[in-house]
Every structure is written in C-alpha cells, then in structure tokens.
C-alpha cells in the first residue's frame, strides 16, 4: 500500500484486498480496526477453489489500512493481493496519484531480519513518503530493533512507522513480521 500522512482524499481513493481460494470450503475472514465494504455485508465469506472476493475500503481522514489481517478460519490455502488505488507519495497532494499492488506471502515465509535501503528519489524528503519503513507484526507479541536502537514490542496486527536516517538500516525481531 501507499501510505500518505495528511492525505487529501478524493472520492475514488481506496484500498483493496483480493482473495482467491485454492481449496473448496475456504472460510475467509477480514479482521481490521477500520470499516471495509464487503460483498455480503459481513467480514467473513466462504469460497470454493478458484472463487475470489474483493474487499474495499475508502480513505477517510488519512486513515490507512495497514495492520488489516486476512485469514482462513479453517486453515485452507489462498492467494491474497492487496493495494491502494489513488495513493500519493507527497503529503497534502491532490494530484499525481498512483496505484500500489502487493502479492502477500504466508507468515511462514516471513523473515526475522531485514536489510532496508532508502529510495533514491530526486525529490526533497520534505513532505514525501520516501524513506519510511512500516513494521507490521503478524503473530503474538513480537519484539524488534530498528537500526540498532532500543527494543520495541508490538502485538499481532500492530503497526509502527520508522524513518530511514539517510543510510541503510537493519531490522531484527523475535518473531515473524513484515516490512513494507
């Protein structure tokens, strides 16, 4: 997803999560602190192999969708793609929008150590969303360090933002987590 602090929202701006089941009878649940629009009015849907569903969420008051959890309640396989329609890389920008799409990986494929390098944008960092690292915890209570700093702890679904101070950074943790 694109994350824009102080975003100027437009009616078409939205986040989405697309799920395709790889098995019959797959009960998919969306767990989020934010309000999502779902095809059946609820946050749970059952899909058969090859069937898919799209959840969408419109932007309101710069609220982001990071930390949203999508899972199979009966532990069946699925493919998940998520993204943002109308993301912006500059704060308070009403034009120059873009689309961001990510193919998610299973928690078992997440690592415990990441090397992160800063983007090489030609723009000044003032007001642009470059050089930001998002840490999203996937299981239980996870402790991590960012760039050798103090140990920080987040619970499942927790999200924290860090700025890269102009050089490569390293993240390590006690459990699996995603760096976005």
Language-model features and meaning:
Residues 1-67, 71-180:
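Conserved functional hotspot residues at active sites or interaction interfaces
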């Amino acid at each position: 997803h694109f994350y824009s602090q102080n975003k100027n929202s437009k009616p078409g701006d939205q986040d989405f999560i697309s799920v395709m089941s790889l098995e019959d009878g797959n009960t998919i649940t969306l767990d989020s602190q934010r309000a999502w629009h779902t095809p059946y009015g609820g946050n749970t849907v059952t899909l058969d192999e090859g069937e898919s569903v799209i959840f969408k969420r419109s932007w309101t008051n710069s609220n982001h969708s990071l930390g949203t959890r999508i899972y199979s309640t009966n532990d069946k396989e699925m493919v998940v793609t998520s993204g943002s329609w109308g993301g912006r890389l500059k704060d308070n920008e009403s034009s120059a929008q873009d689309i961001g799409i990510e193919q998610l990986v299973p928690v078992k494929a997440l690592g415990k150590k990441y090397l992160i390098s800063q983007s090489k944008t030609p723009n000044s960092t003032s007001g642009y969303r470059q050089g930001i690292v998002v840490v999203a915890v996937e299981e239980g209570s996870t402790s991590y360090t960012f760039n050798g700093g103090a140990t920080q702890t987040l619970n499942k679904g927790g999200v924290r933002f860090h700025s890269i101070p102009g050089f490569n950074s390293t993240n390590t943790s006690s459990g699996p987590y995603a760096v976005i």
